[in-house]
C-alpha cells in the first residue's frame, strides 16, 4: 500500500503536529510507503532538512517517498536533496511533464544521482538510453523537444564559439561537465557568426571533405557562412 500525503508540506508548515499524526496513522495501519507531496510546488530545498528530522521520528526513511511539483522551479533539486537526506522513493515524470509548471523531471533526477552523486540506481546500466527515451516521449505526445533541457537537449552539449570548440577538441572537460554519450546525447559543434576556423574545419572533417592545401579558403568560407546566417540561415 502506498499512501500519498497530498499537500503534506504545506500542511506541515500550517500544523506540524496534525500532519505528522496523519502519516503516522497511515503507516501504523499498514501502508508500506508514505509519500510526502508538495502539491502546490512551493517548498524550497532549505526547508527539507528540518521537516524530515520530524518525519523520521515516526516513519523510517526507508519507507518514505516524495512527490514534488515545479511551481518554484525546485522540484528536481528538492527530489535530489530528499534522496541525499535518506528518502528511498522519488515520484516524477519524464521531461517534467505535469499540471501547471510540471513535476520533478526524472531525467535530471536520475542523471544527477548517478553521475554526480554516485548512487547505484537501477537506471544506471540504461542511462545511455535516456536521451532517446526523452525525445521519443515528446514525439509520441507531438511536443517540441526543448533544445536547452539539461543532459538530453540538443543544445546541452552544443558549442558555437571558435575558442570553445578548439578547447573542447583538446579537452572536453573544459566546456562539458560530463561525457555526452553517458546519457546517450552527442556533442554538437555549430557553425555560426561566433565561429572561428575550428568550427569550419571540424564540420568539413565530419563530412569527410579533404581540406589539405585549401586552408586559405576557410577564412573566406567562414565569412560567407556568417553573412548567410545574418540572412536567417543556420548551419
Tell what function each PLM region has.
Residues 67-94:
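Small-aliphatic-rich amphipathic alpha-helix that forms the alpha element of a beta-alpha
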Amino acid at each position: 500500500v502506498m499512501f500519498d500525503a497530498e499537500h503534506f508540506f504545506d500542511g506541515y508548515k500550517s500544523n506540524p503536529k496534525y500532519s505528522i499524526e496523519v502519516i503516522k496513522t497511515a503507516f501504523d495501519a499498514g501502508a508500506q510507503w508514505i509519500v510526502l507531496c508538495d502539491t502546490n510546488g512551493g517548498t524550497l530545498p532549505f526547508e527539507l532538512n528540518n521537516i524530515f528530522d520530524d518525519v523520521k521520528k515516526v516513519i523510517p526513511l526507508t519507507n518514505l517517498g516524495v512527490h514534488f511539483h515545479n511551481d518554484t522551479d525546485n522540484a528536481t533539486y528538492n527530489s535530489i536533496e530528499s534522496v541525499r537526506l535518506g528518502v528511498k522513493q522519488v515520484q516524477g515524470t519524464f521531461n517534467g511533464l505535469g499540471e501547471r509548471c510540471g513535476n520533478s523531471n526524472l531525467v535530471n533526477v536520475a542523471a544527477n544521482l548517478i553521475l554526480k552523486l554516485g548512487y547505484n540506481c537501477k537506471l544506471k546500466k540504461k542511462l545511455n538510453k535516456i536521451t532517446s527515451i526523452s525525445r521519443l516521449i515528446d514525439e509520441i505526445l507531438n511536443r517540441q523537444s526543448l533544445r536547452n533541457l539539461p543532459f538530453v537537449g540538443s543544445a546541452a552539449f552544443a558549442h558555437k564559439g571558435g575558442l570553445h570548440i578548439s578547447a573542447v577538441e583538446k579537452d572536453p572537460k573544459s566546456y562539458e561537465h560530463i561525457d555526452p554519450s553517458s546519457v546517450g546525447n552527442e556533442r554538437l559543434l555549430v557553425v555560426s557568426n561566433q565561429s572561428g576556423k575550428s568550427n569550419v574545419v571540424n564540420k568539413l572533417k565530419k563530412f569527410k571533405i579533404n581540406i589539405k592545401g585549401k586552408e586559405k579558403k576557410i577564412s573566406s568560407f567562414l565569412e560567407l557562412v556568417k553573412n548567410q546566417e545574418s540572412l536567417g540561415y543556420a548551419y
